[in-house]
Amino acid sequence: MARKTLRARRFFSLIFPFFFMTSVYAEQTSVSAKTVTVEAKNETFSPQHPDQYQSWKATSEQSAREDALAEDPRLVILWAGYPFSRDYNKPRGHAYAVTDVRETLRTGAPKTAEEGPLPMACWSCKSPDVARLIQQEGEDGYFHGKWARGGPEIVNDLGCADCHNTASDDFAQGKPALTLSRPYAERAMEAIGKPFDKAGRFDQQSMVCGQCHVEYYFEGKNKAVKFPWDEGMKVENMEKYYDAIAFSDWTNSLSKTPMLKAQHPEYETWSAGIHGKNNVTCIDCHMPKVQNAEGKLYTDHKIGNPFDNFAQTCANCHTQDKASLQKVVAERKQAIHDLKIKVEDQLVHAHFEAKAAWDAGATDAEMKPILNDIRHAQWRWDLAIASHGIHMHAPEEGLRMLGSAMDKAADARTKLARLLATKGITHEIPLPDISTKEKAQKAIGLNMQQINAEKQDFLKTVVPQWEDQARKNGLLSQ
């Protein structure tokens, strides 16, 4: 089908939330009579937009959990000393956004609003309650404090008010009324020359997704969300930005390297690929127009794999049949995976070799250039693999980043071999058994029995209290 047909289909689109955000725990405050409070309860909009709501609700069917650490135990070593070494699952349906952030071992087991390892910002891509709290408290108020503070407030899953101005006349009239509900995302788009209010319809469709499906970090004392785009969106640009401000997410507990952890940079990688360059948006592929029982077109909010709706997605532009395109995508995915594993093997060795160098008496000055190579290698690897769809969005860029990561890791290991030789160590540094997730976690000193027990107690005692309080405050419908 011709490109203009796709554009015609877009014109009639009703866009709902693609990417979703976080929330905070704070007391509900009164608002000015001139201010309409963000409505975070998604079911409120079901009577007005029944097809969109029901398809959004169907994301609960995407319930399978895939344990990425069990699939690839090397990750435990690469993230040693960071919460991701405890628990990392592949993404599932957006209906599980709040559930998953509560249940992941990464958020710990806080007993009070002041406890826990993570800041409030960790809610920011999980719920329309985030937009509500930012409106009520301001950004500084929202970001203040620990993650547990948001428990009784952030209770509705990613939904309508994350991407739509649900209080607007346009939305009431059935128009998309797209909006950036996160002020920090609006500032980031302006930093790359894309102010939302001046963007075209198709740009806006991807920008609302880009509120969450991006790389970000926590800035300053308040741990506020910021996108590292001041120098640009390529991996080297963001690396330069982070290096200039001497930022690190954590220090690897084996190598003592100040590390960067990539998040989920789909907007950046999509922008670098052929679809992004031709303005084929996230919506075109993941939220196509479909017909309801009466033959009326609406935007499918069951965000998913384009191949599941091939006739409404890929076939709008491509002349190849489904099997042919699936074969191409599978080959690209395998190529990315194969190089990914090779880079990980080099990085695992580098972390243990760096530990051996420290143990042998290496100095900070001797280790600094080596740790910088490890930092840059793992950052480039991580930005490539953290975007789970890079084999589709930008396979060439993915391979380029992984190739660069391999070079940096090789540089680090060459320097380590020379340094270790000066310490009288010329044999290969042995690796512990990391053939399973459990063995790898034991190798870095994690007491997973205790961590899991504490989490289960938290889920049984604290989370029910959060939900009871939310119901009393009218934040949950049931």
From Swiss-Prot:
Keywords: Calcium, Electron transport, Heme, Iron, Metal-binding, Oxidoreductase, Periplasm, Signal, Transport. Heme c 2 binds at residues 160, 163-164, 301. Ca(2+) binds at residues 215-216, 261, 263. InterPro entries: Cyt_c552, Cyt_c_NO2Rdtase_formate-dep, Multihaem_cyt_sf. Pathway: Nitrogen metabolism; nitrate reduction (assimilation). Heme c 3 binds at residues 94, 209, 212-213. Heme c 4 binds at residues 282, 285-286, 393. Binds 1 Ca(2+) ion per monomer. Binds 5 heme c groups covalently per monomer. GO terms for molecular function: calcium ion binding; heme binding; iron ion binding; nitrite reductase (cytochrome, ammonia-forming) activity. It is found in: Periplasm. Residues 1-26 form the signal peptide. Catalyzes the reduction of nitrite to ammonia, consuming six electrons in the process. HAMAP family: Cytochrom_C552. This is Cytochrome c-552. It comes from Salmonella arizonae (strain ATCC BAA-731 / CDC346-86 / RSK2980). The lineage of its organism: Bacteria, Pseudomonadati, Pseudomonadota, Gammaproteobacteria, Enterobacterales.
